[in-house]
Design a protein with these regions (language model features):
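Sec-dependent N-terminal signal peptides
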Residues: 1-7, 340-345
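Active-site-adjacent loops and short helices of periplasmic peptidoglycan-processing enzymes
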Residues: 2-183, 187-196
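Domain-terminus/edge residues, biased toward the C-terminal soluble/receptor-binding domains
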Residues: 163, 170, 174-184, 189-367
Length: 367
């Protein structure tokens, strides 16, 4: 059955202008800014989302899409990339004490305290269940810092061929230049579903969370875990600029369907459920309109010489810091280098001052 591309006018508010590639990732039809749906079956239900993808996780077939590669602010759905990137790098049993910076992150927070210690496993739960921006920063700091984590996340996006995705924060908080697409969110979520630890975090409904004294209960923000039969879960997000976003998957009859949406103005849960229902109803009957591509081999995904390459390798008990550490207190090579420059610069300045007898007011030298 042929595929019909229905071209529609789409608002770019909150999106990032981009040049459509000659061959869009996943297939030519996915370059359309409008609805792309198979003929011979009923069209997908209407949704207020500016962009969406419905895909078969098992085969990678894209069953329908709208503006699949439109680049928009991802909000907290970007935490899927954070988790997928950092789960293999950090020992889940490692204990950390979060920095004040991590604890004071704006937006949604799980309530980290500088007086408490947490396992990395706790932080991933807080990230994917409670959408904790504080947990996102604590994980980034544990991974070697914000800059290192951004390099790692963007390298992972390239490996997945999620070329519409540019990560600027580990939490998804809005930042200029940050973007993703419904297609990329589907790629990231599909890769995450193949990771048992990722799948455990996104499917957990409730869990206990440590406090300075005792613990408290946290619950998953994905409402469909309670409302939709077979829901596996993944992640929702919202900011005033990004509006509503979601990527999630459900399994019925041994088959898994995934839906991702971006820029939804209102309450999207029922619409997502309808899109999932449609996906299950046409799976195996409709001609796919595109394909979720496989990740690149490691050699192809590696940055070119001179590019910023991720330096962090998978943390193992043999090389990781002591079991209890403070993420904010990191003695890195860069900090030692800066210290050496400051000391050397100070000595040189003193010699010049003595040699020429120039009086200079103290405190004028800068790093």
């Amino acid at each position: 059955m042929p595929v019909t591309a229905l071209i529609a006018s789409v608002s770019l508010t909150g999106g990032t202008a981009y040049a459509t590639p000659s061959t869009p990732v996943g297939g030519e039809a996915l370059g359309s800014r409008g609805l792309v749906a198979p003929e011979g079956v009923k069209k997908p239900p209407k949704t207020q989302a500016t962009s969406f993808v419905i895909a078969d996780v098992d085969t990678g077939q894209v069953l329908a899409a709208k503006d699949a590669h439109g680049r928009y602010l991802p909000a907290s759905t970007l935490k899927t990339l954070t988790a997928l990137t950092l789960i293999p790098k950090l020992d889940k049993n490692r204990k950390i004490r979060p920095s004040k910076n991590a604890c004071n992150q704006e937006g949604t927070a799980v309530g980290l305290s500088v007086k408490a210690t947490y396992k990395v496993d706790d932080l991933f739960k807080a990230l994917m269940m409670s959408s904790g921006n504080d947990a996102a920063m604590a994980l980034a700091e544990t991974n070697g810092g914000l800059a290192q984590t951004m390099r790692d996340m963007n390298a992972e996006a390239k490996r997945l061929q999620a070329n519409d995705t540019v990560a600027k924060t580990p939490s998804g908080l809005d930042k200029p230049g940050q973007s993703s697409s419904a297609y990329d969110l589907a790629l990231i979520a599909r890769a995450g579903l193949a990771n048992p630890e990722f799948k455990r975090y996104i499917s957990t409904k409730t869990s206990t969370f440590p406090a300075p004294r005792g613990h408290y209960e946290i619950s998953n923000h994905n409402k469909l875990l309670w409302r939709y039969k077979g829901m596996v879960g993944v992640k929702n997000g919202w900011t005033s600029k990004a509006q509503g976003s979601f990527v999630g998957a459900a399994t019925r009859g041994g088959h898994t369907i995934l839906v991702s949406i971006m820029r939804h103005e209102g309450y999207f849960w029922e619409e997502v459920a309808d899109l999932l229902d449609w996906g299950f109803s046409v799976r195996g009957k409709a001609t796919p309109v595109g394909q979720l591509v496989d990740p690149l081999p490691a050699a192809q995904a590696a940055p070119q010489p001179g590019a910023s390459a991720p330096a962090t390798t998978q943390v193992t008990p043999a090389v990781q810091p002591p079991l209890l550490d403070t993420a904010a207190k990191k003695q890195t090579d860069s900090s030692r280098t800066i210290g050496a420059v400051v000391i050397g610069g100070g000595l040189l300045f003193g010699l010049i001052w003595l040699g020429y007898g120039i009086r200079r007011r103290r405190g004028r030298s800068r790093l």
